């Protein structure tokens, strides 16, 4: 039986660690509490630019909590307390002088369940751009470009100005949410189990899209699906009980894990 005390006694196992120069995000000594319950324990990890990093681990291990710490979404939960730093392009986003709303403009997020606005497809994608003051032909050009990058344009080009985003299929709605997120050109895109509510065909479309997105963006994805992590990611983090147990290139984590707990999880002995 794996205990928290046993995990905390061991340092994170790191294979081919990411250098400071390679990192878009540098997490240093991050701990987080929901009220009196500690959810993350002294996590330090770097997320490299233009790569996909997957976060895996059993339910309740802190995957989504870590992900939401990267754009301060956890601030919205009453009673949250954070220690440590999250450096985004060298700036600690938890510095009291940093506006969390401004942070979220730079860091896009796609949730487990598609959440399109009750607006037209066009207005869904235009929403963030309008907040930035983009208007006229530039607005339309950027909406179309985002829909193309999200592999949705060909399916909606004849109706995107008049049809509600709520009328799209589940897979299309998720791609619409991705288009909305990338329209404002965020260097970092966070995805919290983006395909868990989708059928296999829609899942394949999103996975193909993730592989394309890393050419322009840095992507961090939380997934319960280990096969998905193996397919789409360059690096993988394995978490358990709020502790970062092991991190490294995805191929290493899945074929030659160094930590016995990682191996036990990968081979299905717990989880």
From Swiss-Prot:
The keyword Cell membrane applies. It is an enzyme of class 7 (translocase). Its EC number is 7.3.2.1. Residues 13-266 form the ABC transporter domain. It catalyses: phosphate(out) + ATP + H2O = ADP + 2 phosphate(in) + H(+). CDD domains: ABC_PstB_phosphate_transporter. GO terms for cellular component: plasma membrane. It is a peripheral membrane protein. GO terms for molecular function: ATP binding; ATP hydrolysis activity; ATPase-coupled phosphate ion transmembrane transporter activity. The complex is composed of two ATP-binding proteins (PstB), two transmembrane proteins (PstC and PstA) and a solute-binding protein (PstS). The gene is pstB. This is Phosphate import ATP-binding protein PstB. InterPro entries: AAA+_ATPase (IPR003593), ABC_transporter-like_ATP-bd (IPR003439), ABC_transporter-like_CS (IPR017871), P-loop_NTPase (IPR027417), PstB-like (IPR005670). ATP binds at residues 57-64. Part of the ABC transporter complex PstSACB involved in phosphate import. Responsible for energy coupling to the transport system. Its main location: membrane. One of its GO terms (biological process) is phosphate ion transmembrane transport. Pfam families: ABC_tran. SMART domains: AAA (SM00382). The keyword Repressor does not apply. It is found in: Cell inner membrane. Belongs to the ABC transporter superfamily. Phosphate importer (TC 3.A.1.7) family. It comes from Thermus thermophilus (strain ATCC 27634 / DSM 579 / HB8). Gene3D superfamilies: P-loop containing nucleotide triphosphate hydrolases (3.40.50.300). Keywords: ATP-binding, Cell inner membrane, Cell membrane, Membrane, Nucleotide-binding, Phosphate transport, Translocase, Transport.
């Amino acid at each position: 039986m794996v205990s928290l005390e046993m995990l905390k006694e061991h340092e994170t196992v790191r294979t081919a660690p990411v250098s400071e120069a390679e990192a878009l995000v540098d997490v240093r000594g991050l701990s987080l509490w929901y009220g009196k319950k500690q959810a993350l324990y002294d996590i330090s990890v770097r997320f490299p630019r233009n790569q996909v990093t997957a976060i895996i681990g059993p339910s309740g291990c802190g995957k989504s909590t870590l992900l939401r710490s990267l754009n301060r979404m956890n601030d919205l939960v009453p009673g949250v307390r954070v220690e440590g730093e999250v450096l985004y392009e060298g700036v600690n986003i938890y510095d009291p002088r940093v506006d969390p709303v401004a942070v979220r403009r730079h860091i896009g997020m796609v949730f487990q369940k598609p959440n399109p606005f009750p607006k037209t497809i066009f207005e869904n994608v235009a929403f963030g751009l309008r907040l930035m003051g983009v208007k006229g032909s530039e607005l339309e050009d950027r909406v179309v470009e985002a829909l193309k990058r999200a592999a949705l344009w060909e399916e909606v080009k004849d109706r995107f100005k008049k049809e509600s985003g709520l009328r799209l299929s589940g897979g299309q709605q998720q791609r619409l949410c991705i288009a909305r997120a990338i329209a404002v050109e965020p260097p970092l895109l966070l995805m919290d189990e983006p395909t868990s509510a989708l059928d296999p065909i829609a899942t394949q479309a999103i996975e193909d899209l993730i592989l394309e997105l890393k050419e322009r963006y840095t992507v961090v994805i939380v997934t319960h699906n280990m096969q998905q992590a193996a397919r789409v990611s360059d690096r993988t983090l394995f978490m358990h009980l709020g502790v970062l147990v092991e991190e490294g290139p995805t191929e290493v984590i899945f074929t030659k894990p160094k930590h016995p707990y990682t191996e036990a999880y990968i081979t299905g002995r717990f989880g």
